[in-house]
Amino acid sequence: MTAGERYPVVVTVGTDHHPFPRLVGWVHRWAAAHPDVRVLLQLGTTEAPEPLASVHAVDLLPHQDLVAAMAEADVVIAQGGPGGIMDARSVGRQPIAVPRRGDLGEHVDDHQVRFTAWMAQRGLVHLATDEAALLLELDAGLADPARLRIPPDGGAIDDTITAFRAVVEPLLAARRRNR
């Protein structure tokens, strides 16, 4: 990825060692039918599909590069783990989440199926459990990118830092006084 490149669609399969060919295949078929839309596709351990001019496929990206691409994207599609979902939300993008399935060898079990259903019930992700749902969400997101924009969500990080500071700062102040 070159600095300054913008991809309207960013897809991440995460860093799990299991391949995720189902999601990669769905996105690849969509991209082949939409050659005018640039896609950044982070593959992880999934085998790269046939190259398309509109798709920049990479095994892994440095975390800061992936998050920066998410911030510039109209649509972020993430596997159903908390890392990619929270990264997208942290930069103001409500992701389309596609859970990995244990019965397909995409993960050890179906915890992503349960997790993404829980997130979707609370309006925190758009859930796509099959190709038709993914394409519907993807097309709707490109037609109206505002529907996938949210205020940047730092999650509990800010609260955790505040609580940490409340405990540590008095300890440091006491230590300084006792020197």
Give residue ranges: language-model regions.
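Hydrophobic beta-strand scaffold residues
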Residues: 39, 95, 126-127
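A donor-sugar binding/catalytic signature common to diverse glycosyltransferases
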Residues: 66-108
